[in-house]
């Protein structure tokens, strides 16, 4: 069996586990959690800064940032610095609350597993 065939069931199990434990499925993904975490400790970050911090591709970061924006967890402002396009993100109050809930839930799960 090829490695990608083994990975699909693992991803499906992870999604089912997130749903079963009540974790916020919007946040429960590596890049989206990284975006929210970075924005929680920075007032604002540009697309290029986030891309570098998260080691993400342009397309990957765009898709995940859009998903967070649709959920109301971040805002996105597009503009220009001189003639260069610039995209800047900020976490919203709802995003900060959702991240806090998510982290509390994860801490409780970890505590339960550790006993």
Where in the sequence are the language-model features?
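Glycine-centered, phosphate/nucleic-acid-interacting loop/turn motifs that mediate DNA/RNA or nucleotide
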Residues: 72
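Short, hydrophobic-biased segments on the C-terminal half of alpha helices
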Residues: 65-66
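N-terminal helix-turn-helix DNA-binding core of bacterial DNA-binding proteins
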Residues: 18-60, 81-90
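Amphipathic alpha-helical dimerization/coiled-coil segments
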Residues: 1-20, 34-37, 93-115
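Short beta-strand "wing" residues that participate in macromolecule-binding interfaces
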Residues: 76
């Amino acid at each position: 069996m090829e490695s990608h065939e083994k990975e699909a069931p693992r991803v499906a199990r992870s999604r089912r586990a997130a749903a079963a434990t009540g974790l916020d499925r919007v946040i429960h993904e590596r890049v989206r959690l990284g975006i929210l975490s970075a924005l929680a400790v920075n007032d604002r970050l540009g697309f290029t800064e986030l891309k570098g911090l998260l080691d993400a591709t342009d397309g990957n970061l765009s898709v995940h940032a859009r998903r967070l924006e649709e959920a109301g967890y971040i805002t996105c402002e597009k503009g220009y610095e001189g003639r260069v396009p610039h995209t800047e993100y900020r976490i919203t109050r709802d995003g900060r609350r959702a991240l806090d809930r998510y982290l509390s839930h994860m801490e409780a799960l970890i505590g339960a597993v550790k006993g």
